[in-house]
Regions:
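Hydrophobic/aromatic-rich transmembrane helices and adjacent perimembrane loops
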Residues: 150-205
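Specific aromatic-rich, kink-prone transmembrane helix
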Residues: 14-40, 58, 62-64, 182
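Transmembrane helices and adjacent periplasmic/lumenal helix-loop junctions
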Residues: 33-61, 145-149
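Aromatic- and kink-enriched transmembrane "portal" helix at the membrane-lumen/periplasm boundary
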Residues: 1-15, 45-50, 160
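Extracytoplasmic catalytic-loop and juxtamembrane helix elements of membrane-embedded
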Residues: 90-120, 157-176
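Perimembrane helix-loop-helix junctions
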Residues: 53-82
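Signature aromatic-anchored transmembrane alpha helix within multi-pass, membrane-resident enzymes
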Residues: 79-83, 195-224
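Hydrophobic, aromatic-rich transmembrane alpha-helices
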Residues: 128-156
């Protein structure tokens, strides 16, 4: 669904982000943390908000590798890199190229939305719930159990806090395309962990429990 909207829309720079996120997602599922960071780092050159996505990837890797000092520390530095790249881009680079000296797409909450709270901006109008439903289904529901699922949060946050109606839609435009490889990566990550649990459960006579879950995962993924 995310790719269909992007294909029907105009060309956008997110076309460069999709394969990078796909390779990063595959590396995460395989447990190759250095490869995840290598594929994710160029995202800061694609679009201004993706520095926040890089930051979240670093935090997710730190969480997954928290039992090892190096696997915990290096991803934290990577998260800081993503955050710094975001601020340098939106506070220095983009204003320098703008005649008015500002970041034209800042989330100022304008467009006649009145005096509303941050929570109201994030959760209203109800059109946003369609996006929430689709990302949950896009991860096969069970993908929400993967820390990789949290990589979508910066994108969801700026879209929901933004004042442009197109940001809140799941059917059209290109804004959902970068979510797809992340959601599939989250789904595959949970499936891989289930498979590992099944291998250990077979020896204890409980393999039938996890084996019954595979058809459900496959059905949800194929339907989407």
């Amino acid at each position: 669904w995310g790719f269909q909207g992007a294909v029907a829309s105009q060309f956008h720079e997110i076309a460069f982000a999709v394969p990078l996120l796909a390779w990063a997602s595959a590396a995460f599922v395989e447990g190759r943390w250095v490869a995840v960071m290598a594929w994710s780092a160029p995202l800061v050159l694609v679009k201004e908000d993706l520095g926040l996505t890089v930051m979240m990837i670093g935090l997710v890797l730190a969480w997954r590798g928290r039992e090892n000092e190096k696997s915990f520390t290096y991803p934290l530095f990577f998260a800081v890199f993503g955050l710094l790249a975001f601020f340098v881009t939106v506070k220095l680079l983009l204003p320098a190229f703008n005649a008015s000296g500002t970041w034209a797409y800042s989330l100022d909450g304008s467009s006649n939305r009145g005096d509303v709270t941050l929570i109201e901006r994030a959760l209203w109008p109800a059109q946003k719930y369609g996006v929430i439903a689709m990302v949950i289904l896009g991860a096969g529901i069970i993908g929400m159990a993967s820390p990789w699922f949290w990589v979508i949060m910066p994108t969801i946050a700026w879209r929901f806090l933004g004042s442009v109606d197109y940001y809140w839609d799941w059917k059209h435009w290109h804004y959902n395309a970068i979510l797809i490889p992340i959601l599939l990566g989250a789904l595959l990550d949970v499936h891989r962990r289930w498979s590992s649990q099944e291998d250990s459960s077979i020896s204890r006579g409980w393999g039938w429990v996890t084996s019954t879950q595979r058809p459900l995962v496959a059905t949800i993924a194929l339907a989407l």
